[in-house]
Design a protein with these regions (language model features):
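N-terminal beta-strand motif that seeds the catalytic metal site of vicinal oxygen chelate
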Residues: 1-19, 31, 37, 84-87, ...
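Conserved positions at the start
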Residues: 5, 41-43, 118
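Conserved beta-strand segments that form the floor/walls of ligand-binding pockets within enzyme
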Residues: 7, 11, 45, 57, ...
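Core segments of cupin and vicinal oxygen chelate
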Residues: 11-61
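Vicinal oxygen chelate
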Residues: 15-16, 64-130
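Active-site beta-strand termini and strand-to-loop segments that position acidic
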Residues: 47-51, 123-126, 136
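Short, basic, helix/turn surface patches
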Residues: 56-64, 135-138
C-alpha cells in the first residue's frame, strides 16, 4: 500500500539558477546534489525546511535521459512560458513573505488575495514555473 509521497519533480531551464532560487530565496535545504557517472544526469533535490521528508527534484530539461532533442526544446518552451503549475507551498505569513520575496525580485503573477481556503499569492520561479504560496485558514 502506498504510504506517502517522497519526491516531486520540477523541470527547470538551468539547475544552478533554480538552486539559487529555491535554496537562497525560498530557503529550501539541499538534500542531494550529485552527478551520475554513466549518464551525466545531475540528481539535485531540496526540501522545504519544515518538511524534510519531501524532496523536490530540480530536473534540468536538457539533462534528462527521458527526452529526445525535439522534446527538450518543446519542454524548455513550455516551462519558460509558465505552462506548468507545480503545486502549493504553505506559509504562516503570506504578507511578510510577499514583501520579502518582492524585495528580492521574485515575480508574482498575483499578490496575496483572500480565497475560501486561505490567502494565496501566485509566484513564478526563475524558470517560468508558477506555484501557489498559500497561508491556509486556521
Amino acid at each position: 500500500m502506498i504510504q506517502r509521497q517522497s519526491h516531486s519533480t520540477i523541470y527547470v531551464i538551468d539547475q544552478d539558477e533554480a538552486l539559487k532560487f529555491y535554496r537562497d530565496i525560498l530557503g529550501f535545504e539541499v538534500k542531494t546534489d550529485m552527478t551520475m557517472e554513466v549518464s551525466g544526469f545531475r540528481w539535485l533535490t531540496l526540501s522545504p525546511k519544515g518538511q524534510p521528508d519531501l524532496e523536490v527534484i530540480l530536473a534540468q530539461v536538457s539533462s534528462s535521459p527521458m527526452f529526445d532533442a525535439d522534446m527538450v526544446e518543446e519542454m524548455k518552451a513550455l516551462v519558460s512560458r509558465g505552462a506548468f503549475g507545480i503545486g502549493v507551498f504553505e506559509t504562516d505569513d503570506i504578507h511578510g513573505d510577499y514583501g520579502r520575496l518582492s524585495k528580492q525580485g521574485v515575480e508574482f503573477v498575483s499578490p496575496p488575495q483572500e480565497q475560501f481556503y486561505g490567502t494565496e499569492a501566485v509566484v513564478k520561479d526563475n524558470s517560468g514555473n508558477w506555484f501557489s504560496l498559500t497561508q491556509p485558514k486556521r
